[in-house]
Design a protein with these regions (language model features):
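Phosphate-group recognition and catalysis centered on beta-loop-alpha active-site segments
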Residues: 1-241
Length: 241
């Protein structure tokens, strides 16, 4: 006879659950005083009690920095490519009048007060990125998860650092087959799903066994959609919960 007892909900004990404030996308930024992925934006998110989502890139000398773009043109006015620049090369640039932060600097600032979602911009360099990431994270004792569009990184983490919570970032542009391949390879413990895909039936199926967070929640309409179909909001601007 089949038991009438329902299976436990794996989302109920999600160690990365940020609570009602959700995750501030690239910190709490406004494009003026508080620039995305800056220590000021992260400090503002901390003040608001929000979790922090941010982007990580690897420099030419294997240092992990907090930066979204592949080059420094949009934020720093220089075409310097991050992957071809050393940390010393990048030290002359500023983000909102402050140096580009490193991952250790972010960890020191947060100090376990809120959960972190760390999106690794791997760019086909998993074998360098993985060890550099582990070295930066090793002393940290706060809550965090590492995620990537590239399913090879969570797979690498499963093999080499199974204690790190690993996630897959999923856009709405993936076909069903490519998404299945990515999910199978990554074997994620959580998903970060594009707002354009969050209402699709496959997300509801996945949520029976994994938490699914939603990016990027920017409007009240996005917020309502994410409230129905996601376990946490990754938000900015008017998407704030």
């Amino acid at each position: 006879m089949r038991s009438s007892r329902s299976a436990p909900d794996p989302r109920a004990s999600d160690p990365l659950a940020p609570g009602p404030p959700g995750y501030a996308h690239r910190g709490l930024h406004d494009g003026a005083t508080f620039i995305e992925n800056s220590l000021l934006a992260f400090a503002a998110a901390l003040e608001a009690g929000a979790g922090i989502e941010c982007d990580l890139r690897l420099t030419a000398d294997n240092q992990v920095i907090v930066f979204h773009d592949a080059d420094a043109l949009r934020l720093c006015g220089s075409p310097a490519v991050i992957a071809r620049s050393t940390l010393a090369d990048l030290a002359r640039f500023t983000v909102g009048n402050h140096p580009i932060p490193t991952l250790p600097q972010l960890l020191t600032l947060v100090d376990g007060h809120v959960p972190l979602l760390l999106e690794a911009k791997v760019e086909n360099d998993v074998w360098r990125f993985g060890p550099a990431l582990l070295a930066a994270l090793e002393p940290y004792r706060g809550r965090y998860g590492v995620m990537s569009f590239d399913p090879r990184l969570p797979r690498w983490l499963k093999t080499n650092a199974p204690h790190i919570r690993r996630g897959l970032v999923v856009s709405d542009r993936l076909s069903n087959f490519r998404r299945w391949i990515a999910m199978t390879l990554a074997d994620p413990q959580f998903l970060s799903v594009d707002i354009a895909a969050i209402g699709q039936p496959w997300v509801a199926r996945v949520r029976r066994r994994l938490p699914a967070y939603c990016w990027t929640v920017r409007t009240p309409a996005d917020r309502a959609l994410a409230a129905t179909h996601a376990d946490a909001h990754i938000w900015e601007a008017d998407g704030r919960p």
